[in-house]
Amino acid sequence: MKKIGHLMKYLIVSGDSNTTADFDSISHPDMDFSYKKWPELLAEKLGMKVINVARSGQGNEFIYTTLRDEIVKIEDKSQIGLVIAAWSQAPRKDYKQEENPSFRQPWPWSSIRIDTHGNLPYWVQRSLGYYLNFQILCERYNIPYVQFQMIELFEHYLQGILPDPIDVHFGADPNSQSKYPGNKKKDEGSILKMILEYEKKLDTSKFMGWPPVKKLGGWRFRDQLDIWYDNNSPRRVSPLDCHPNGLGHIAICDKINILLQEYKIIKE
């Protein structure tokens, strides 16, 4: 048990729809998703109290910013047992709207799937910066931390974007695929070089799967389980929805717990 006297330490986690406690599915609006998600399950294994600020559809600016805000909010940093960043896709653009007194929003953050400014190499560079910012922040306060790329960072955009579940729900052809707008070979080479250069700046012993690209010999967390690849996996919501179900979140929790021990983030 990770405790301060009689108090449990905090496990702080941020990510996207594969991590949020408030997941729902447009493909299955009547399905019950009230089961425990992996951050809560992991906190129970580690004897910690979870703070899960993940939200569906969000990108890496959101993930970094919400983790930073939770960390600085806690005055006694010794109360923080572990912080986990489960990174999302680089092209996503996050933005925050100030609360309007005449219209109370339940959540100030929103996002768009593809940023309308910049290009793929820039978006990846921006995400690499968030990796580094997160590391520097945790080192500044001497907080135990780990990070990993939960889903693909950029490859999906390079290969051509498929419609998201919302588009498919409203009639888009699920097999239609957009064409990459840039020079695919040149941009991929630039991105891979950029990622390798960041290896000199990051503490990769605390970045599980580094480098987060299969072509460079690393992995994304989605490569570790069949949830995202096998349409008939018993651990995903359905063939239509590749998100983890209750069994999937248990599998994610168990795998992360094993990796935390392998990377010596926590003791066995």
Task: Locate the predicted segments by residue.
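Alpha-helical cap/lid subdomain in secreted, periplasmic
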Residues: 4-5, 68-268
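Serine-esterase "nucleophile elbow" of acetyl-processing enzymes
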Residues: 5-66, 73, 251
